[in-house]
Amino acid sequence: AVAREGFGMDVHIFDPYLAPDKVPSGMTLHPSLESLLGLADYISVSVPLTASTRGLIGAAQFACCKKTAVLINSARGGVVDEAALYAALAEGRLFGAACDVFEQEPPTAENPLFSLPRFIGSLHIGANTEEALIRVGRTVASDVLAVLNGREPRFPYGQ
């Protein structure tokens, strides 16, 4: 929503578990990941690493992307197949990519992605700021108090 309002973007999403009536206002839900990838200028990956999401974005998915698309992976290492990402970038099938998560963390200087001019890599440290740690502590404490007082927590485990 922030991107849509701040940058004038159309926001399209794919979520196999999201009911159509629960789609946030102003967003378009796609029936498949591939249909979304074929339209996207910027692809932001935001999923946990599970058995079903490991390698979620691989060679077949990159084949669906526009050659002008940019991939942003700040989810978890292993969700994007790095060998397939390297091939897509090196062969010009994807314009660019930025990742702050890698299959091997921390990434080594020998990671071939770092040799590509249209790849930006950084460490996944966004949650390690003092402000983020304080916010997490407050959120956990608030949810514990909610449960102790017979209310639903704001962030129940597993949801």
Describe each model-derived feature in a short phrase.
Residues 68-159:
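Rossmann-like dinucleotide-binding domain for NAD(H)/NADP(H)
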